[in-house]
Swiss-Prot record:
One of its GO terms (molecular function) is transferase activity. This is HGPRTase-like protein 3. The keyword Transferase applies. It comes from Haloterrigena turkmenica (strain ATCC 51198 / DSM 5511 / JCM 9101 / NCIMB 13204 / VKM B-1734 / 4k). It is an enzyme of class 2 (transferase). The keyword Transferase applies. GO terms for biological process: purine ribonucleoside salvage. Keywords: Purine salvage, Transferase. Signal peptide: none annotated. Belongs to the purine/pyrimidine phosphoribosyltransferase family. Archaeal HPRT subfamily. May catalyze a purine salvage reaction, the substrate is unknown.
């Protein structure tokens, strides 16, 4: 395992798992903002992303609200690449693109602003589960004519059906829920 991610892996092993209408959902600072996320772990996440993807020539980082925001922000601060947040509410701007997302545990609309045709973007999110959020964000980006350079998540649930995503995704760590506990898969 990458030494920069060992602290993240240790903290994940402590994450409680809750049942959310039949979906086993783990609760961690990376994915939920609680418990508090150690700044050293957040910095290690940004470093891990920088080590795994080519950010040369990227114009914009794109992070879905809500839990992609802090990972996108940390990466933006580390790279000086601007960040756009795909919001869960509309501002009604003329160039706004609305898309519908369906995830393992719900559905909603997302709204993209601030990305233009020809922009080279990297999508940053917390976890790949069904892929519904990432696929919706990518559809919005393609609708405005952006070039998706890479998609990166901090975590990938290997026990989930990624059937909603049709694109390659880079992840820092693989995890699964087994017997009511979160495991890091090495």
């Amino acid at each position: 395992m990458d030494p920069t991610l060992k602290q993240l892996a240790r903290s994940l092993r402590e994450a409680p798992v809750v049942d959310r209408d039949g979906y086993e959902y783990f609760v961690h600072g990376v994915t939920d903002g609680v418990p508090p996320l150690d700044p050293a772990v957040l910095e290690a996440i940004a470093d891990g992303i920088r080590e795994r993807i080519d950010l040369e020539g990227v114009d914009t980082l794109v992070a879905p609200e809500a839990m992609g925001i802090h990972h996108g922000t940390a990466l933006s601060l580390a790279t000086r690449i601007p960040l756009v947040v795909v919001r869960k509410r509309s501002y009604g701007f003329p160039e706004e693109v609305a898309v519908h997302q369906e995830t393992s545990y719900g559905e909603s609309d997302l709204y993209l602003n601030g990305v233009d045709a020809g922009d080279r973007v990297v999508v940053v999110d917390d976890v790949l589960s069904s892929g519904g959020t990432i696929e919706a964000v990518c559809e919005a980006l393609e609708a405005v004519g952006a070039e998706i350079v890479d998609i990166v998540t901090v975590l990938r649930r290997v026990d989930a059906d990624h059937g909603d995503i049709s694109r390659p995704v880079t992840s820092l760590l693989d995890v699964r829920v087994r017997d009511g506990a979160l495991e890091v898969v090495e």
